[in-house]
Regions:
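Bacterial Sec-dependent signal peptides at the C-terminal "C-region" and cleavage site
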Residues: 10-26
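Glycine- and acidic-residue-biased ligand/ion/polar-headgroup-sensing regions
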Residues: 57-71, 75, 162-181
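Bacterial N-terminal signal peptides that target proteins for export
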Residues: 1-9
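Short acidic-glycine-tyrosine-enriched beta hairpin
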Residues: 77-93, 183-198
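Short beta-strand segments in beta-sandwich/barrel cores
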Residues: 51, 68-72, 89, 156, ...
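Histidine-centered metal-chelating micro-motifs
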Residues: 48-52, 90-100, 155-156, 193-206
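A short glycine-rich, His/Asp/Glu-containing loop-to-beta-strand
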Residues: 27-52, 57-62, 113, 128-158, ...
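Ligand-binding loop in jelly-roll beta-barrel domains
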Residues: 95-116, 199-221
Length: 221
């Protein structure tokens, strides 16, 4: 009787520890912004720590801000090595239930960008391919993703984002943003800072700082 009870208890405890929470309830995922199109989480996992098993119900892109050596485990499967570097971008289809353990010596941080819906747009063309500083790094049925790299003094020139999107700073930087009919803005950015825009927007970005500036632009199709 005691042995049977102990076995049942072990099974129940295993079920508790294996149960998953929605991503918004996972304590290392910090919700920073949400509208009808996007949810943005700032994720931080210190060395030796792990997320809970959590479920992503929406497709998402993540931008690695601080890389680390990880173990990633999809629920029901064995853990696998996942070594990410700063600036790395990946797209994941939903649904996904998983957890991540930081087995390295550095904090792991990323910006997780959930795609809730697609704004109405008149174009699905890759609108930044010929813009200075931009390189297409990911393209699928949901998003275009570009890496932006500007050395000190470099500028994108005036260009138009035809699609709604989110820009995420990967490095520190001081940039000057100029839009037609508006005053120039000088903005100091930290890694993980982000900006959302709905609909088309036209501007130029110039690196007015003393170090290379890197960012990632995610455009909704």
């Amino acid at each position: 009787m005691i042995k049977a009870f102990a076995t049942i208890l072990v099974i129940l405890l295993y079920a508790v520890f294996q149960s998953a929470v929605p991503v918004a309830s996972e304590p290392r995922h910090h919700l920073k912004f949400e509208n009808q199109y996007v949810r943005v989480f700032d994720v931080l996992v210190p060395p030796g720590d792990a997320t809970l098993f959590h479920t992503h119900s929406n497709d998402y892109v993540f931008v690695t801000i601080s890389g680390a050596n990880l173990k990633a485990q999809v629920m029901g499967a064995q853990p696998v090595d996942l070594n990410l570097t700063s600036g790395e971008v990946r797209f994941t289809k939903a649904p996904l239930t998983h957890r991540v353990t930081n087995v390295g010596s550095t904090p792991f941080r990323n910006i997780t960008v959930e795609i809730l819906s697609s704004p109405s747009s008149t174009s699905s063309a890759a609108s930044l391919e010929n813009v200075p500083g931009h390189t297409l790094v990911l393209d699928n049925e949901r998003v275009h993703v570009y890496r932006l790299v500007l050395e000190p003094g470099q500028s994108t020139g005036i260009h138009t984002h035809e699609l709604s999107g989110l820009g995420v700073a990967v490095s520190t930087g001081e940039i000057e943003i100029e839009s037609p009919g508006q005053q120039r803005q000088t903005v100091k950015l930290q890694p993980g800072d982000f900006r959302w825009h709905t609909g088309a927007t036209t501007h130029s970005i110039k690196n007015v700082g003393s170090t290379r500036f890197e960012a990632v632009n995610i455009e909704w199709k």
